[in-house]
Amino acid sequence: MNERFYPILATLAVLALLYGYGIFEHRAFSDTYVLGALLTDNAFLIITAVGMTFVILSGGIDLSVGSMIAFIGVLMAELVTGFGMHPLMAALISLIVGAAFGAFMGVIIAKFDIQPFIITLAGMFFLRGVCFLINLDSVPIDHPFVAAFSGFKVQLPGRGWLTASALLMLATVIGGVVIAHYTRFGRNVYAIGGDRHSAELLGIPVHSTIIRVYTLSGFFSALSGVVFAFYTASAYPLAAVGVELDAIAAVVIGGTLLTGGMGFVMGTFFGGIIMGVIQTLIAFDGSLNSWWTKIMIGALLFGFIVLQRLITRSFSGMRAGAT
């Protein structure tokens, strides 16, 4: 079997073990209610992580996504409650703004050859600051469409349901899979992350691809902000603090190499679900502090980073043997 599948197989094994343990310990864990809640509660994180997957596949990082979610929420609240705009129009404007800001960071990263870490860190601070310029307090988004979005449900067998947030997240994952594996852009992202110099020699448009990667990340984090705002029917400048780290964790647990060039969008989906399952198991237990979620996710990250290192060493050894 190709070694590039090892990380995602490890991800699936961890997910199966955790879910199996949950069903063994708590009979209610097998109810579709839990599955529906997992998909809904982690929808905005997984949408963000899909965009982060493309960034990490290209060999970059985007620390601005959490601040983008908060900014989009505050922007939408201002457009809907302050200017009387329909939420769908506000969402469209927000998506354009998010993609444009991502493109702006991508241009700086690509054209000036600056480390993505420092540029997206600047973007993180900038967007969070702008949130407080717009509004200092939590703002409710009171509109019939938002209420309808929050209340929309598709019944699953048993007691479970799929909400609008979960359905949008699943559509985003499918779209991400198509872009990553069935488009020239997706193949270019993998090539750049695998070996940027070789990609340039092959004539791949490295600069424009990187710009599009950060545009895509900005779009997906803006979409996550829209979903989060609709789901909570409110906006707050301090929303989604630390989500950028959770998104990176979901991508890594999902089997994408931090060095770039190897990974799967579906793996990111499973990584996000694993993080949700851990939170749910701790909630079901009742005797454990919520900080155990961070401890378990940290332990998983240690394991997956070591696995990634072993795989990259194996590939390096095969390349050396081939030469």
Report the location of each language-model feature:
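Structural signal for alpha-helical transmembrane segments and their membrane-water exit/capping regions
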Residues: 14-30, 58, 131-135, 177-184
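Alpha-helical transmembrane segments within multi-pass membrane transporters and channels
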Residues: 84-124, 270-275
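Transmembrane alpha-helical segments in multi-pass inner-membrane proteins
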Residues: 221, 231-298
